[in-house]
């Protein structure tokens, strides 16, 4: 991407980027605070609350680092040194990977938790939190190793124009790598994401089947004049399906924008669009969780009630 194009990107795009960061940080902060309060207030906290709190914290840190990077894209005068560039971009890449991993593993835990007693997944209910924690630590180590090449390929932007590097922000540039190294890292990332997305798809298919089963039971109950009010499990299943669908749509859209950007060396507008799309899930998903969980609505209702009374 050309530096001049980066500097003169549409003002509306800058505003949208900063707005997304601000809204996402606020939403994830709210989600994190609520689940920390739930964890501290329960004698036997549920693992699902711990994982949601961790996911919201990961997304919060991701959006904060993204905000710093976006600020350096549009507002800085290129004051970061190589160590700052390497550290921030490495942390951002690591947090993006951990967000993907945490989202997929959270959906696995949700699927196991909501599975009926007759399901073959029942035997994993008590063991799943430990197994998922181990899987997350494994992926964490894997992501750290996958992103380690950034310490060699990210440099402070030099005061010259060259085809050997690509501008990331005003302060930071990415050195071009050899074809073999690029292929190796691309293949490793593709395998990692294919595995997690496949896991995501399996959970989605299972949840669709589970939701259909609930609906069929509701129809049978309705035909016998028994209340067919949605159960907490059904509401949770719909929430998970909504988040899964949104995640998959954004993932496909992000890859489409990325491949389009690769065809245009100076596609600064596409670069901004990719940033917006790739962080949309971290911004929107907390609102879905906040608005669909009754405990969270009651929590914020009581908090605002206390503020008004004061």
Curated annotation (Swiss-Prot):
Deleted gene: phenotype: Mice lacking all but one V1ra and V1rb gene (12% of the V1r repertoire) show a lack of chemosensory response to a subset of known pheromonal ligands and changes in maternal aggression as well as male reproductive behavior.
Stretch forming the signal peptide: none
Glycosylation sites: 159
Residue ranges that the UniProt entry lists as topological domain Cytoplasmic: 42-49, 115-134, 212-238, 291-310
Key word Methyltransferase present: no
Cellular compartments annotated: Cell membrane
Residue spans, topological domain Extracellular: 1-20, 71-93, 156-190, 260-269
Protein's GO biological process: response to pheromone; sensory perception of chemical stimulus
Keyword Lipid metabolism: no
Membrane topology annotation: Multi-pass membrane protein
Domain of life of the native organism: Eukaryota
Transmembrane portions of the chain: 21-41, 50-70, 94-114, 135-155, 191-211, 239-259, 270-290
Primary location: membrane
Entry keywords, A to Z: Cell membrane, Disulfide bond, G-protein coupled receptor, Glycoprotein, Membrane, Pheromone response, Receptor, Transducer, Transmembrane, Transmembrane helix
GO molecular function terms attached to this record: pheromone receptor activity
SS bond partners: 85-172
Function statement: Putative pheromone receptor implicated in the regulation of social and reproductive behavior.
Similarity comment: Belongs to the G-protein coupled receptor 1 family.
PANTHER family, alphabetized: VOMERONASAL TYPE-1 RECEPTOR
Name of this protein: Vomeronasal type-1 receptor 41
Record gene name: Vmn1r41
């Amino acid at each position: 991407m050309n530096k001049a194009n980066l500097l003169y990107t549409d003002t509306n795009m800058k505003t949208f980027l900063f707005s997304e960061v601000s809204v996402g940080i606020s939403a994830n902060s709210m989600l994190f605070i609520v689940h920390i309060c739930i964890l501290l207030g329960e004698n036997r906290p549920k693992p699902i609350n711990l994982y949601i709190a961790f996911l919201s914290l990961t997304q919060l840190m991701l959006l904060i680092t993204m905000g710093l990077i976006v600020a350096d894209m549009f507002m800085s005068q290129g004051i970061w040194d190589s160590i700052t560039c390497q550290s921030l971009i490495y942390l951002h890449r690591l947090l993006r990977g951990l967000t993907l991993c945490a989202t997929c593993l959270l959906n696995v835990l949700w699927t196991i938790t909501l599975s009926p007693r007759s399901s073959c997944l029942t035997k994993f209910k008590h063991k799943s939190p430990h197994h998922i924690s181990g899987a997350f630590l494994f992926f964490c180590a894997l992501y750290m190793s996958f992103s380690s090449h950034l310490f060699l390929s990210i440099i402070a932007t030099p005061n010259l124009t060259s085809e050997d590097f690509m501008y990331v922000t005003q302060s930071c540039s990415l050195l071009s790598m050899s074809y073999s190294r690029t292929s190796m890292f691309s293949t490793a990332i593709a395998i990692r994401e294919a595995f997690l997305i496949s896991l995501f798809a399996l959970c989605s298919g299972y949840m669709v089947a589970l939701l259909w089963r609930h609906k069929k039971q509701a129809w049978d109950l309705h035909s016998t004049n028994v209340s067919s009010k949605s159960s907490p499990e059904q509401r949770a299943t719909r929430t998970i399906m909504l988040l899964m669908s949104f995640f998959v749509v954004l993932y496909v859209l992000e890859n489409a924008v990325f491949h389009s950007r690769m065809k245009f060396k100076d596609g600064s507008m596409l670069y901004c669009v990719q940033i917006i799309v790739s962080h949309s899930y971290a911004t929107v998903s907390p609102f879905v969780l906040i608005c669909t969980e009754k405990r969270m609505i009651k929590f914020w209702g009581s908090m605002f009630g206390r503020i008004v009374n004061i």
